[in-house]
Amino acid sequence: ELPRELKARVKTLKSFDENYYEAPYEFTTSLAAWKLMDIKEKYGRHAFCGMGGARTSCESSYVFQKFVRNAMNSPHVDNCARVCHSPSLKGMRTTIGEGAATNPFDDIYKTENIVVMGSNTTEAHPIVANRMIKAARDKTATLSVIDVRQTQLSKFGEQLIIPYEANLLVLNMMAYVILSEKLYNTEFIDSRCTGFEAYKDSILNDPYANPEYMKNVSGYEYLTEQIPTVARLYATKKSMFFWGLGITEHLDGSYAVMAITHLSMMTGNIGKTGTGLMPLRGQNNVQGACDTGCLPYYGPDYSVPEEIGLMTPQLIDEMIAGKIKAMY
């Protein structure tokens, strides 16, 4: 039952329509806060969850997860970026230790080779695409676009139409060419990498990693020649690798991102001007929402929280089951 002071104020509210009332901001927040605490007391702290977003600022994302974890004492906090680009975070943190782009977009003007995979860049990231198109038109960089369909960006460079669900296959084929032709950067590998020999043996002994395999895939036989060409350009020039949701929203998304980072490390295309790894995020603060801890399994700065919460699909199941009573 409502507290006496809130109940008294409800009676004075002006009707907006048959379902809603007009109410001052201070009163509505007080009412919402009371209801959340009422749910917590009746059903426990796990009956509440928070769903953040990747279009908010870093500051608001930090305060949001702090409210869920510290004020409501619930571990259930998530945001939409975990669904779309968590494979980039996982793949990059596993291989290079940090799940973020490694260089600024203006490095596009300083690179010699651009590879774009799984991204309709002109539509989704037009400011980035403008830089790519300028570099391709000015012939300061070669451009290779790898996708399951033809995109507008491919008009300005080489287009590789690949089979559906073949991202990891194609990336391993690029690695096979670089390894078999010894185009890798031995100095960088010796000073910066571990596990190279095991990785090399794994790729070279995988029959599906040889681009010759594409001769057996009807309609894609031409990739037997195109994939090695892209791989050689990537290995022998200052190169940047861009990818989008066409990589990450697949079952093998994390592994595909790891394959991309492996390519950059063994060729030394990271940590220098005009080289690097560039995940193209779906919203304006995907990186910040994750960095500040709006994830069920990470706190701010990717610290491990005291309790791991549920992810969005699990939370929806819990709502249907009647176990989650409130979501903010």
State what each model feature region is.
Residues 16, 114, 155-156, 209-213, ...:
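Flexible glycine/proline-enriched surface loops and loop-helix/loop-strand junctions
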Residues 103-105, 231, 316:
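Short hydrophobic/charged patches on amphipathic alpha-helices used for structural packing
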Residues 234-321:
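A glycine-rich, hydrophobic/aromatic-adjacent loop/helix-cap motif
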Residues 75-76, 178-186, 251-252, 267-274:
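Short helix-capping/linker segments at secondary-structure and domain boundaries
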Residues 1-183, 191-205, 223, 227, ...:
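N-terminal export/assembly segments and adjacent metallocofactor-ligating motifs
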Residues 202, 227-238:
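Core structural elements
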Residues 49-57, 216-220, 244-251:
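Conserved short loop/turn motifs at secondary-structure junctions
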